[in-house]
Amino acid sequence: MLQTLYVIAHTFFKICKLELGPQDLPNSKAFLLLVAVVYMGISTIIPILFEIPILKALLQTFVEINITFFLTFSLLYLTGHYSRIMKTLTAIIGVDIFFHLIALPILLLELYFKSISVDIGLAQILALLLVGWNITVYAHILRHALSSEFFVGFVITFVYLLVTIVILQSFFPISPEALTP
């Protein structure tokens, strides 16, 4: 069991290092479902850290994962890469788990600094670097899924990001007070 978890985690880590792509994952509905369930659990924790009620956090995560499913399905179906949908979704959701796990200590560091009224910007810099890495990995995954150049994957990643932000903001608006330190 631990060996299997190690292999899975190592595979997603290699995707994050741009060494593997979605084509290196199994084409399995059960594996996609497992990855999606783990993602739902981990992604629900982060909003709770910021005192968002658990039901709202679950709903937000549910909406977010459905956006990912819809955008990925639409993109690959419309470009004639229907057979790559399951592997691509598994890759995107799996690397999101990885990035959420890395983000947790950064967010906890930020909360700690806020609790002692210190702002050195370290958590923000780390978070920005993490977002940049996440965008790069998404572009890498989409490039492989579409058999295209990295630039194409990069542009599509920004469209994904924009659409996701707009939809999430329409369902779960962030008040201006929440953005002020």
Model-derived features: positions:
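A general structural signal for short secondary-structure boundary/capping elements
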Residues: 5, 139, 173-174
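Juxtamembrane/disordered regions of integral membrane proteins
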Residues: 46-51, 107-110, 176-181
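Short, exposed beta-strand "edge-strand" segments with a Pro/Gly-rich flavor and a Y/T-containing core
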Residues: 19-27, 141-148, 160
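Hydrophobic alpha-helical transmembrane segments and adjacent short intramembrane/lumenal linkers
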Residues: 81-155, 163, 167-168
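Selected alpha-helical membrane-embedding segments in polytopic membrane proteins
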Residues: 2-89, 96
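A generic structural signal for ordered alpha-helices
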Residues: 19, 36-37, 44, 53, ...
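Juxtamembrane boundary at the C-terminal end of a transmembrane helix
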Residues: 165-181
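Junctions where cytoplasmic loops transition into the N-terminal start of transmembrane alpha-helices
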Residues: 31, 157-161
